[in-house]
Amino acid sequence: EREELVESDNDVHAGEFETSLVLAVREDMVDERTIPEKEFDFPDPKMEFDHEPEFNYTWNTHDLTKTGVIGDATKASKEKGEKLWEAGIERLKKRLETVIDISYPFE
């Protein structure tokens, strides 16, 4: 799963996770020579991004970084992206199986 594959803390936008996903399916769209070094960490641990859907807050990434990247894309890889896609597809499959198994009208 994501937690096991993604090494970076606060990997929010265009970092290790998203870049790995793109490398796996459209490697031609990633110019690895232009990937910036990690430049941003949240100043307060309470602000850290935890990928939990219960509570989200937003910001303009360009207010936080010069590049708009929040994460460390230098740790991205095609192989990691392939594993992330496989894990995501498996999660989606399980969710769909749950929906299919729900009988209607509800008992």
Go through each PLM region and give its residues.
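Extended, histidine- and acidic-residue-enriched regions that form the cofactor-binding/catalytic faces
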Residues: 1-107
